[in-house]
Amino acid sequence: YESLTIAAPGAEETLWNIEGTINVSLALTPGLQSGHQVRVYFDGEPQLVNSTSFTINEVYRGVHNIQAEVLDETGKLMIRSRPNRFYVQQTTVRGIR
């Protein structure tokens, strides 16, 4: 692989009112090869996915970090992205007195 970057969410991006779900998009050149998997670290917790576009649920307000790497069919690390830090904000409506 030549390059792997996290296209979305962007580095230092602030996401508003996401209702607990983020869409993640990776830019991988060349594309994901048959039998290879993506391991994503979201706030340090790993999960395996079979695509360069996916969603992560139960994402709450605060600062978050995401990083991705591609593994071959034997689990060997092929390439790793730089980590991205992003922020989730929630609009708060104050009560009327």
What are the language-model segments listed below?
Residues 1-17, 89, 93-97:
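Short, compositionally biased P/S/T/A/G/V-rich stretches that sit at domain boundaries
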Residues 76-87:
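Edge beta-strands of extracellular beta-sandwich domains
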